[in-house]
Amino acid sequence: MMFMLILMSCSHWTITTQPLAAPWLIPRYLPPLHLHCEGPLQPLSRVVLMCLCILGLILNHPLFLVWGPSFLWLHRCHPLFTYLGGIIIYCQVISCGLNDVNVSTISLQMALWRPNESKVYLPPTPVSKVISTDVYVTRTNVYYHGGSSRLLTVGHPYYSIKKGSNNRLAVPKVSGYQYRVFHVKLPDPNKFGLPDADLYDPDTQRLLWACVGVEVGRGQPLGVGVSGHPYYNRQDDTENAHTLDSAEDGRENISMDYKQTQLFILGCKPSIGEHWSKGTTCNGSSAAGDCPPLQFTNSTIEDGDMVETGFGALDFATLQSNRSDVPLDICTNVCKYPDYLKMAAEPYGDSMFFSLRREQMFTRHFFNRAGKMGDTIPDELYIKSTTISDPGSHVYTSTPSGSMVSSEQQLFNKPYWLRRAQGHNNGMCWGNRIFLTVVDTTRSTNVSLCAAEVSDNTNYKATNFKEYLRHMEEYDLQFIFQLCKITLTPEIMAYIHNMDPQLLEDWNFGVPPPPSASLQDTYRYLQSQAITCQKPTPPKTPTDPYANMTFWDVDLRESFSMDLDQFPLGRKFLLQRGTTPTVSRKRTAVGRGH
């Protein structure tokens, strides 16, 4: 409409209409209509112009007469664009000449909807949706404090020591660069003495714990642990000038400090680690001395596993045959790194609903490796020397360093409150257990102990003394748990059974197997030689899925208390909530009759 008004108000104008539809859709009966006018339009002229435009459309498409009267109503919406019962109509203003004004061509169209002639794609099969625990778990206002006693461990920082003919473990390996995975066992709230007997209905509901606060206490002073190898594969100091050495064994006694790491991960399942291990070759085409293929491997992080120290998350026992490319404490071990990607993408979010980490490292020394080069440098990368035939080792390596440790950068000895987990599990302790994975290399000091072999020590002689190395660790774990209840409707029971059937077994809500319609044979005397040999009964599946794994067990089943103000973490919890203890220990006085 605005376009038509502009035309009608101009002193000189020209309008040309031309059908653009294909000949098989809109036949062309007359040539395009050309109109030219000079001078401003009078009201009567505007009416004439409108009629001429309508006439041009009618002449270019006779079918327009079928619903021509409706055009007067549609014209108010747009004068150059109409819809004709499923047929495409194109109207184009080819040229519009105004005095000293350039106007571009305007093209208007409307597509015709046709049935889809391509392949029909069915929607994907619906899958069960994982819902948050906040949907079907109801939280109460009852809180408990649970804390461990002082937890201590002492051992050798590089290797375990075995003595005797039976290789009895005398001193375990305890390093500041090991994972500490605490398996915290909680009491069953359904067998707990509650302050309010009407808190839940035992016929249709079950109780469980939700972790809402945690503090990992660390004792011992800050310190940097040093590791090394008496036969470290260090050929040259590539940071400084050197001379090529053709010795067969150029290993040296080298020590270093590792990357600095602080982390702890909280979940109701153990943390998942990742590392690179030795893979398999296709068709057995590998020969002795070939580079081993690498395979990405996931595994559960257990207590005592080595952390990634700056040399990579590798299985050094299978990928480094010389036992001298890394220090003693990891040369025959697997260094694992937490698989944060997999734990974050876990459907139910049980392995990591709370985590903290801090890592830092820089490179201190630069070396290269001694040995025969497995990969040859391409000739186009360098110009050969006329005096040196062998360019030497180009397998460069470095020694890591975690730099300075400071109390200002500590993640421990601080309370943390869990309000919203990153996954669907918002702190629910399924199975009355939680797993706490801890790494703290800022307290990795290795102490030296010395014992004299002779009583007369007036004159110093190094061979009269024996030197020992030990590492000590100290922990204190405190938690705040919130009592929650869950109503076991058929839908919720089916959902929990799909998530973990053992939970319903622990709650005495077992799902019986479907009845068998086939007839089974049962012999009476199973040990009789008169009958065929009977298959042994399959072993019963252990109820504890982590029985064969190594964890530091912490039993809190007798350490729960509602007196939050009697514990450091409990007082901090009450302070941040702005509340005071609501449970009264006073008994109501009972009146006596006289």
Swiss-Prot record:
- Which GO molecular-function terms appear in the entry? structural molecule activity
Q: Which InterPro entries match?
A: Capsid_L1_Papillomavir (IPR002210), Capsid_L1_sf_Papillomavir (IPR036973), dsDNA_vir_gr_I_capsid (IPR011222)
The subcellular localization recorded is: Virion; Host nucleus
| Disulfide bond keyword on record | yes
Q: Which Pfam families match?
A: Late_protein_L1
Where are the membrane-spanning stretches?
A: none
Q: What is its main location?
A: virion
GO biological-process terms attached to the record: endocytosis involved in viral entry into host cell; virion attachment to host cell
Signal peptide feature range: none
Record keywords: Capsid protein, Disulfide bond, Host nucleus, Host-virus interaction, Late protein, T=7 icosahedral capsid protein, Viral attachment to host cell, Viral penetration into host cytoplasm, Virion, Virus endocytosis by host, Virus entry into host cell
Does the keyword section mention Disulfide bond?
Answer: yes
- Protein origin, superkingdom: Viruses
Functionally, this protein is described as follows:
Forms an icosahedral capsid with a T=7 symmetry and a 50 nm diameter. The capsid is composed of 72 pentamers linked to each other by disulfide bonds and associated with L2 proteins. Binds to heparan sulfate proteoglycans on cell surface of basal layer keratinocytes to provide initial virion attachment. This binding mediates a conformational change in the virus capsid that facilitates efficient infection. The virion enters the host cell via endocytosis. During virus trafficking, L1 protein dissociates from the viral DNA and the genomic DNA is released to the host nucleus.
The subunit field of the Swiss-Prot or TrEMBL record says: Self-assembles into homopentamers. The capsid has an icosahedral symmetry and consists of 72 capsomers, with each capsomer being a pentamer of L1. Interacts with the minor capsid protein L2; this interaction is necessary for viral genome encapsidation. Interacts with protein L1; this interaction enhances E2-dependent replication and transcription activation.
Protein name (record): Major capsid protein L1
Organism of origin: Human papillomavirus 27
The lineage is: Viruses, Monodnaviria, Shotokuvirae, Cossaviricota, Papovaviricetes
